[in-house]
Amino acid sequence: MPYLDLSPDFKPYYEIHDATDPWTRPQTIVFVHGFTESTEAFRAWVPYLSRQYRVVTYDLRGFGRTAPVDSDFTYSTELYVDDLVRVINHLAGEPVHIVAFKSGGISTMRLAATRPDLVRSITLACPPMVAPGGADWQPFMEAHGMRAWARKTMPSRLGKDAPPRAIDWWTDLMGATSITTARAYLRWVGTTEAGKDMPAITCPTLVILTKLSEQTNVAAGQVPPETVQKGMPHAEIKLLDLDCYHPAASHPDLCAPVMLSFLQKLA
């Protein structure tokens, strides 16, 4: 399995999907997943994009096949940005398009704000503009385990009409995260305010949102689309009439074509 040897404590698992014509020089898309996810979260998106773009996915520090971290590990937005910079430099070597799911948008927005030289565009799928995370998440994880937490929170994540087998699959994926990583991540993510980076972002930006409601968005850190538009007047906003806060997972066949159309307009 491919791993990047970036530092003694960060050797991320990664995948490259490239179905472009071998005589062309495609641009690169880098995916950044959210809490308790991995490269597997992008599997339905890759076929839409890999015929025209070189697609890079990787497991963030602490998640998937990248090594877990200890409970007392100190996550920070700056650390995740540095990790992302090193992945881009090693696997692309030039500016990239970035697609971020949920809290993956925190480091993506900071990178776009502070290192515009590395970013062609960003696509943010339901990013948390204020601190995400339910107050009862960690106590429930500690009492019942990661898999039970994943299943309990799945209806708001995927929507009330999500097929049972989809709920099972995402529960297995997200429930595999180490409780030590979850403790460290939640301690960090609860302090973030990604929305403050919006005014500094100038690259082409697509934001995919779902309708705001307490039921679906209280734990996701989302804000009304008007707030996003005010913070990033240049952004293209796609508002989906769905009762979930993770449409990139629940409705990839809606979201991925929107993103592909957005990129094609930049060409």
Question: What are the residue ranges of the model-derived segments?
Answer:
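Active-site loop/oxyanion-hole signature of alpha/beta-hydrolase fold enzymes
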Residues: S7-F10, D21, E40-S50, V56-V99, ...
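Alpha/beta-hydrolase fold catalytic core
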Residues: M1-V30, R51-R54, A176, E236, ...
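Conserved alpha/beta-hydrolase catalytic His-Asp/Glu region
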Residues: H144-A200
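Active-site glycine-rich loops that stabilize anionic/oxyanionic intermediates
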Residues: P26, G34-E37, K102
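Flexible "cap/lid" loop of the alpha/beta hydrolase fold
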Residues: I106-T114, L118-A148
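Structural cue for short, hydrophobic secondary-structure segments
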Residues: F31-G34, T57
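Alpha/beta-hydrolase active-site loop signature
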Residues: T36, L60-G64, M129, C244-P247
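Conserved loop-alpha-helix segment in the C-terminal half of the alpha/beta-hydrolase fold
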Residues: T202-L254
